[in-house]
Regions:
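A short acidic, leucine-rich amphipathic alpha-helix
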Residues: 53-56, 72
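N-terminal leader segment of winged-helix/HTH proteins
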Residues: 1-28
């Protein structure tokens, strides 16, 4: 468990479970556990929260909350909202789960896929001019580049698909998969 266990009386059990689970999942995805827990709390909150509210509810250091808020804002997953009569910053999460997924995917593409494509292109180009590169290594670099570019193109195409059509496409994919034979094929 994490920090919030001693503060659990302040949160309903399902909310606490979700926050803890989201924090664990975040750490598996390469996101700081505190960042993921704060996102989960704001996602489920019925009202905008201050950094002090977050720190108290989750039992986190205020500095940790501040840094985590900056990271969530950089991912465009939360926003600062003004509250009339209160000078403190309040924060709320994007609650449209499709939008959350799109923003996370965009952030991961920018931070991971784009640099990978650039690096692989450079490696393939450099390998073409290097007589010390084995044909096996050259072939595998080209295959990895082709795969990464394919994933990148697919992502870019999916950005332009309206949500209702995307939902229909996902459901269609489920139906198609049910007709395919099971087991791995090469």
């Amino acid at each position: 468990m994490t920090e919030i266990s001693e503060y659990s009386a302040k949160l309903p059990a399902p909310v606490e479970q979700f926050i803890l689970h989201w924090g664990d999942m975040g750490s598996h995805w390469g996101v700081n556990r505190s960042v993921a827990q704060i996102h989960a709390l704001l996602y489920l909150s019925a009202r905008p929260l201050t950094a002090d509210d977050i720190a108290e509810t989750l039992g986190m250091a205020r500095s940790n909350v501040s840094n985590s808020i900056k990271e969530l804002q950089a991912w465009n997953l939360i926003r600062r909202v003004p509250i009339l009569g209160d000078r403190r910053d309040h924060f709320e999460a994007e609650t449209d789960i499709w939008e959350v997924a799109a923003r996370i995917a965009a952030g991961r593409k920018e931070r991971e896929i784009d640099p990978a494509v650039d690096a692989l292109r450079a490696c393939v180009s450099d390998a073409a001019d290097d007589p010390t590169i084995s044909p096996v290594a050259s072939k595998r670099l080209k295959e990895m580049l082709a795969f990464t570019e394919l994933v990148d193109r697919f992502y870019m195409q999916m950005l332009n698909v309206p949500r209702p059509r995307l939902v229909a496409l996902i459901k269609l994919g489920e139906k198609i998969v049910s007709f395919l034979p099971t087991g791995k094929t090469k």
